[in-house]
């Protein structure tokens, strides 16, 4: 009997271990309670009936190929049924290949014009909760549109072209490895997409992308049918931290705007990717690093970004656009709707705020002509 009991226990142990591992895995995917340090930084339900210009601004801008931008005229507050309650929501309209109405985008073109609203505030680590509906129950997946939620921040830093291959003692934020759009033109870029639907007209696996300066990782995750013409809650938790970097000396960095910036090519770029450092002591530094961006829809874990996660803050963008890579848009109008928006900031030690501070600039006017700066 003792031998039988021992054998039974030995047989059961792997099963118990497997169940324990499954339980731990399930627990890691659970959307937990907010950290005690979390601060509610944005709570928008549109109940005032107006888009508050101290909180938000609408873009008149074109980027990418095969479209004519986004315009403020395609952004408005309307009434809609959210769950069982009729309330005000943000409506971002898209004009397809058959649109012939009065609203125009770049070059006064009518087709393939969307609408995007952007927060005035820049955010870093924290929880982002956005209630969004794509299309309608009758047409939940309008081909050709890219409905999206994303954070974005940027900063251009310039030096004369003849100095472009080296660091600059007068411009410590300039980095020769971040040159873009010409010699001496460095660009800091922070972006998280959570998510971006519609590539190739598909809505099953939206993109969850990360952009860290010159680095980028595109991922897709199963949205489990959330593009169904109904409201769903999209939640993303962004975390940052400090990653110790060995061998960096005080003589190899310059202090600017509260952070330390590498000024020596002997420090391998791959160790910090253009991110600033924090000083821990004499000849001791840590990189301000993005750690993870984890994603849920209606409380169900969707996936996680762990590569090229930014640490620099960005503004929250909500809306819809129609790039070439979304495919044909064989209809007149479609729309994406946003109900309540909430953002809690965590203030993680790797956060970099106060560096990317500019609003996104318009690049064409109401007349459709490019703006010259």
Cite the ranges covered by each PLM segment.
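GH16 jelly-roll
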Residues: 21-373
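Positively charged n-region of N-terminal signal peptides that target proteins for export
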Residues: 1-4
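Bacterial N-terminal signal peptides
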Residues: 6-17
